[in-house]
């Protein structure tokens, strides 16, 4: 099941990078101000 482990690590790394960029740059989507 090494493939599953490598896949998990790959997804985790991409997830961390994605969130790092996402939170570094404010999302350009209209927010609802309640």
From Swiss-Prot:
One Gene Ontology term, aspect cellular component: photosystem II reaction center
Transmembrane segments: 3-23
Membrane topology: Single-pass membrane protein
Pfam families: PsbT
Matches recorded under InterPro entries: PSII_PsbT (IPR001743), PSII_PsbT_sf (IPR037268)
Compartments reported by the entry: Plastid, Chloroplast thylakoid membrane
Ribonucleoprotein listed as a keyword: no
Keywords: Chloroplast, Membrane, Photosynthesis, Photosystem II, Plastid, Thylakoid, Transmembrane, Transmembrane helix
Example of a GO biological process term: photosynthesis
Main location: plastid
Matches recorded under HAMAP family: PSII_PsbT
Summary of the function given for this chain in its UniProt record: Found at the monomer-monomer interface of the photosystem II (PS II) dimer, plays a role in assembly and dimerization of PSII. PSII is a light-driven water plastoquinone oxidoreductase, using light energy to abstract electrons from H(2)O, generating a proton gradient subsequently used for ATP formation.
Complexes and interactors: PSII is composed of 1 copy each of membrane proteins PsbA, PsbB, PsbC, PsbD, PsbE, PsbF, PsbH, PsbI, PsbJ, PsbK, PsbL, PsbM, PsbT, PsbY, PsbZ, Psb30/Ycf12, at least 3 peripheral proteins of the oxygen-evolving complex and a large number of cofactors. It forms dimeric complexes.
Family, per entry: Belongs to the PsbT family.
Protein name as it appears in the record: Photosystem II reaction center protein T
Organism of provenance: Glycine max (Soybean)
Gene: psbT
């Amino acid at each position: 099941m090494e493939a599953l482990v490598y896949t998990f690590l790959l997804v985790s790394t991409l997830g961390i990078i994605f969130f790092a960029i996402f939170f570094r740059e404010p999302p350009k989507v209209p927010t609802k101000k309640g």
